[in-house]
Amino acid sequence: MENIILIGMPLSGKSTLGRELSKILKYDLIDTDTLIEEMEDKSIKEIFKIYGEDYFREKELKIINKLKKESNKVISTGGGLPIYNKNIYELKKIGFTVYLKVPLEELIKRMVKKEDDARPLLKNDDTKFLEEMYKNRIEIYEKAHTIICNTNYEESLIAIVKAYKKWKGI
């Protein structure tokens, strides 16, 4: 499958870079959180509040199964999608996985700066929770095909496209 799958912590830039990558490569963009919101006709925050995290993770599994039939897509995942149910291995079968590795200090800055109601697991004052999440997830994220360690937007795009072309043998 020739998809690019962006994984990483909340606030790592998956959605933003995904939009630009899809334009550059002329691939359709799929945002897994947006798909779930459309399926449920509710925001992620509402889904968590009404049905709980387990229900949300089941929906993510359904999305992964649908994605197995897709090609030439840029897929931006929710931060937890690769973590649960060993989904990272399923994602690697679907396409080229890219871990957008952002230093914890930068994620904390972004969290404090961005008051975002859409992220049910993050509150703008909960740096301890973010630190714990980072520690618990990093090992799985690092199983991606490539790791982009860059907070510069343009350089990240260039690095992703280069790594993807190398993976494809172009």
Swiss-Prot record:
The keyword DNA-binding does not apply. PANTHER family: SHIKIMATE KINASE, SHIKIMATE KINASE 1, CHLOROPLASTIC. ATP binds at L11, S12, G13, K14, S15, T16, R119. Its cofactor is Mg(2+). This is Shikimate kinase. One of its GO terms (molecular function) is shikimate kinase activity. It catalyses: shikimate + ATP = 3-phosphoshikimate + ADP + H(+). It comes from the Bacteria. Belongs to the shikimate kinase family. Its EC number is 2.7.1.71. One of its GO terms (cellular component) is cytosol. Mg(2+) binds at S15. Binds 1 Mg(2+) ion per subunit. Catalyzes the specific phosphorylation of the 3-hydroxyl group of shikimic acid using ATP as a cosubstrate. Pathway: Metabolic intermediate biosynthesis; chorismate biosynthesis; chorismate from D-erythrose 4-phosphate and phosphoenolpyruvate: step 5/7. It is found in: Cytoplasm. Keywords: Amino-acid biosynthesis, Aromatic amino acid biosynthesis, ATP-binding, Cytoplasm, Kinase, Magnesium, Metal-binding, Nucleotide-binding, Transferase. InterPro entries: P-loop_NTPase, Shikimate/glucono_kinase, Shikimate_kinase/TSH1. Substrate binds at D33, R57, G79, R137. Its main location: cytoplasm. One of its GO terms (biological process) is chorismate biosynthetic process. Monomer. It comes from Clostridium botulinum (strain Loch Maree / Type A3).
